[in-house]
Amino acid sequence: MDVRANLRSIRISPRKVRLVTDLIRNKKVGDAIVILNNTNKKSSVPVQKLVKSAVANAVNNNGLDADRLFIKEIFVNEGPTLKRFRPRAHGRAYEILKRTSHITVTVSDGQQ
């Protein structure tokens, strides 16, 4: 059975979050949490919380065994972009894009 958890509008660029999510795809949940604990990236903390949330959803809502779960699918989509402006010389302004991410993780026990 597949169980899903979402994290929306996290204030980290999707490109940076994908570096972390690519490390744990198709791994067992226990192994993924160990990898995230030892990854020195800002996005590893929210991704780890999201994986733990998906496991809690699977155990509490669907009665699945946490030891049998693995990360079936994890992907990052682009969220809304905050636009800011930085003043420059001669009355100009440069646009700064503060990007956000939506992260979705699906855990499964391998059965239908």
From Swiss-Prot:
How is the quaternary structure described? Part of the 50S ribosomal subunit.
Sorted alphabetically, the Gene Ontology BP terms of this entry are: translation
The function of this protein is: This protein binds specifically to 23S rRNA; its binding is stimulated by other ribosomal proteins, e.g. L4, L17, and L20. It is important during the early stages of 50S assembly. It makes multiple contacts with different domains of the 23S rRNA in the assembled 50S subunit and ribosome.
Q: Which protein, by its recorded name, is this?
A: Large ribosomal subunit protein uL22
Annotated keywords: Ribonucleoprotein, Ribosomal protein, RNA-binding, rRNA-binding
One GO cellular component this record assigns the protein to is: cytosolic large ribosomal subunit
> Which family does the record claim for this protein?
Belongs to the universal ribosomal protein uL22 family.
Q: Species lineage, top-down?
A: Bacteria, Bacillati, Mycoplasmatota, Mollicutes, Entomoplasmatales
Q: Which PROSITE patterns match?
A: RIBOSOMAL_L22
User: GO: which molecular function terms?
Assistant: rRNA binding; structural constituent of ribosome
